Amino acid sequence: MGKNIKVSFKHVSKEYDLYQNKSDKIKGLFMPKSQKMQSFWALRDVSFDIHDGETVGLIGINGSGKSTISSIMSGVIPPTQGEVIINGETSLIAIAVGLKGPLTGYENIRLKLLMHGMKSSQINKLMPSIIEFADIGDFINQPIKNYSSGMRSRLGFAISVHTNPDILVIDEALSVGDQTFYEKCVDKINEFKARGKTIVFVSHSLGQVKSLCDRIIWMHHGEIREMGTAQEVAQKYDEFVKWFNKQPNDYKKKYQKEHKENQKAPQKKIYPNPNANKYRLTLFDKIFLTVLIALTILFGTLVATGKSFKGLISEESTTQIEKVVHVDNYDLKLN
């Protein structure tokens, strides 16, 4: 293609342990790998390249692995097997990802931009533009936990596009909200495309994917079923959906059950992860990392809100502090 590769997945697989309860999860920390609980392969041997300036769509039925790919691509979770190469800074736009419920919209903006390494002067300069783009009115000064899903998506999108990422990953963020905001987002996406940015667009809407994307990757129960031009793959996927919807309910249930059972089967071929040592943590490492992340988020919250630790406790209560420092977007049970 003659363009630099921005994202490369090489034989990537992602395994999750299927715990029945919290006690099983704790036991899993101490059990050797040979005695692990039953697992589920969300991805199996996935390989693709995305080039500089491309807009690539990820489509597939629920549970096909689309969001797992976007999370790995954004650095939220690591792969279990294979190699992932990202050349540039990635920003993930998904409903409520990275937004802290107890904080106001204004405070979330400051916190997110601080975590992107921006200085206070840069944040103050961007703040009016972000608030205007989000267009949520007086709710900007209300806690995120009181927002609708559409308002969360608006704010998340507004923040992410103002961080000027090299690679923009949009995971179902345009599935909520009104037509006016959707058109505003599409205009911003087209602006990014004109600037040569790389965009990965995850959606169930074939119309959106066909109009915005150059290529499509069709994920099906953790594997790539088709990959090619937007028109070709969208047509094949549309034909599959229409065929599947015509089948009797008993057949649909059997079809889905068989494929999900296959995803529980052991991986037939093992592809080593060149960064395995980087991802493999001891129990002490996991505890230390959890505390470190919690303190980092707490410190960022204090800076974003301009409050002291004592003031935050008295105003929000100890329960709210626990919510602020709760790390819900990290998979510390690394395989």
Curated annotation (Swiss-Prot):
Entry binding sites for ATP: G60, I61, N62, G63, S64, G65, K66, S67
Highest taxon above the source species: Bacteria
Listed InterPro entries: AAA+_ATPase, ABC_transporter-like_ATP-bd, ABC_transporter-like_CS, ABC_transpr_TagH-like, Bact_Polysacc_Export_ATP-bd, P-loop_NTPase
Annotated ABC transporter domain residues: 26-246
Subcellular location: Cell membrane
Alphabetized UniProt keyword annotations: ATP-binding, Cell membrane, Membrane, Nucleotide-binding, Translocase, Transport
E.C. numbers: 7.5.2.4
Subunit-level organization: The complex is composed of two ATP-binding proteins (TagH) and two transmembrane proteins (TagG).
Role this protein plays: Part of the ABC transporter complex TagGH involved in teichoic acids export. Responsible for energy coupling to the transport system.
Family annotation (PANTHER family): TEICHOIC ACIDS EXPORT ATP-BINDING PROTEIN TAGH
Name of the protein this chain belongs to: Teichoic acids export ATP-binding protein TagH
Organism: Listeria monocytogenes serotype 4b (strain F2365)
Gene that specifies this protein: tagH
